[in-house]
């Protein structure tokens, strides 16, 4: 907590705390097995609220003129859930296959994790529910790219190999306006071998439908000289989702002590020069000049 508070990142700590212990009940894509419409036929949002009502304020008034608790009770008494379940029967499914009871959750660690370490001193974000278990703890060899176009070309032409960490940088709020790294994540996740053996690490962002071992929002971003800007080919990147860490643990393919890594990064930082803004006019030029880091929300100051 003190780590985040000392950097003015109390909200990051709050998100981390809320996710740890949060029950994960829903088995729909991309993190789960079934299409999103099955969520509706399993009872949808009301069913989720029914499962978690012990932590809800059931006495709050709603637009129906009734309290939340009264609305949920009405749905139950009107046979809403039984009507929904008939569609699932056609697929030989039960409601519990889509929405688990609270005490039988798929997981109890939420769906989002904030990682930090010497690669992301302010933090980075991973949707761990879509990451293959074998990638929860991994040490990978860095393949840095200064834009998504170069990275996806390398993936599609098979220049990226199992055991690599694809680093896409200068795509954060100040770097390029923080576009979505959708094409690269899909190219990796759709390859059975790469999806379970490499990771994508970026100061850019992802969509809610992304899947696979993708870590985004790395802060500070490359455009302001964050550690992600200093990574070179072959550096070793360690991911440890259970420990919530993301660190550079080796240089040029060889693991070394943290103090040695810090010394090398300090040398590289002394030689680093910021890139010119790729936008010369318009809204994106204004945004990139005034945006704060992604971990703080990427808003304009």
Task: Indicate where each model-derived feature is located.
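Single conserved hydrophobic/aromatic residue that forms the stacking wall/gate
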Residues: 2-13
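Feature captures the catalytic cores and cofactor-binding loops of soluble hydro-lyases/lyases
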Residues: 11-301
């Amino acid at each position: 907590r003190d780590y985040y508070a000392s950097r003015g990142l109390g909200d990051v700590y709050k998100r981390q705390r809320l996710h740890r212990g949060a029950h994960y009940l829903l088995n729909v894509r991309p993190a789960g097995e079934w299409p999103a419409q099955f969520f509706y036929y399993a009872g949808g949002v009301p069913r989720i609220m029914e499962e978690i009502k012990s932590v809800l304020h059931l006495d709050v008034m709603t637009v129906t003129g009734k309290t939340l608790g009264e609305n949920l009770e009405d749905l139950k008494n009107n046979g809403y859930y039984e009507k929904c379940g008939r569609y699932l029967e056609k697929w030989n499914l039960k409601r519990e296959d889509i929405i688990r009871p609270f005490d039988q959750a798929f997981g109890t660690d939420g769906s989002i994790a904030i990682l930090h370490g010497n690669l992301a001193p302010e933090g980075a974000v991973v949707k761990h529910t879509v990451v293959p278990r074998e990638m929860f703890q991994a040490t990978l060899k860095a393949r840095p790219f200064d834009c998504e176009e170069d990275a996806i070309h390398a993936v599609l032409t098979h220049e990226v190999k199992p055991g690599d960490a694809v680093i896409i940088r200068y795509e954060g709020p100040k770097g390029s306006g923080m576009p979505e790294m959708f094409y690269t994540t899909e190219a990796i996740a759709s390859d059975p071998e790469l999806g379970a053996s490499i990771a994508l690490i970026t100061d850019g962002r992802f969509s809610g439908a992304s899947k696979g071992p993708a870590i985004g929002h790395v802060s500070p971003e490359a455009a302001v000289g964050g550690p992600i800007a200093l990574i070179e080919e072959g550096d070793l990147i360690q991911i440890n989702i259970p420990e919530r860490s993301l660190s550079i643990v080796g240089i040029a393919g060889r693991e070394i002590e943290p103090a040695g890594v810090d010394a090398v990064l300090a040398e590289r930082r002394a030689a680093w020069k910021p890139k010119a803004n790729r936008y010369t006019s318009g809204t994106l030029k204004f945004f990139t000049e005034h945006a704060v880091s992604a971990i703080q929300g990427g808003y304009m100051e």
